[in-house]
């Protein structure tokens, strides 16, 4: 395993983590999302921003002043990893560090209009041993099969994927771009049921605040069949 992630314990009063990542082109505005998450979701949720030393070799000295000050004030945690795992580092390493707790994803270009983290956690099963993820999709995207990717935001139950070290293959992940595809492939390989989907549109939950496009979009210009074919190929490669 390339990264050495220490196990962590959440601060008193926290019940889950909100995980997000960012990169050079969005680092100057991610503070807006973090401040919004703190205000909307409150102290029950520990915010973790995962960044790569490969992309920010001088670490905090390269970050905007607002991020540094909020981090020092304890508003959120910066989790540094060595390699730039791109979008894959949003959930993976936070999930390793806080494996005993639910992990909720957030996007670095969004303002959240209400406490979505609390809503997602509410739908987790009471039995902690039961693996479940809860996400948002509107009707036209909601599917119940294994190939259902995560939606606009997702809550993963504790230790959702278990040990995933063997599936962290950088070159393969970079080729397929999308962390959502990787999550689908892992669910299929590990026989974890598909997500619970809450029927809400993107605009019900967030307002974008950054116009910089993502590096890659799994859904842009692809039919459902084309997307599923890509995921099938990805599963085959991961199982080798």
Predicted ranges, named:
Residues 13-17, 38-49, 74-77, 101:
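Short loop->beta transition adjacent to catalytic acidic/histidine clusters or analogous donor-positioning motifs
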Residues 20-22, 51-53, 135:
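Short beta-strand/turn micro-motifs composed of small residues
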Residues 23-27, 54-56, 109-112:
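Short acidic, S/G/P-rich loop/turn micro-motifs used as interaction or catalytic elements
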Residues 32-45, 53, 69:
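Short, acidic, metal-binding catalytic loop of nucleotide-sugar glycosyltransferases
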Residues 50-56, 139-141, 201-202:
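Short beta-alpha junction loops
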Residues 50-101:
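Active-site-proximal specificity loops/subdomain of glycosyltransferases
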Residues 94-95, 106, 110-172, 176:
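Conserved catalytic core of nucleotide-sugar-dependent glycosyltransferases
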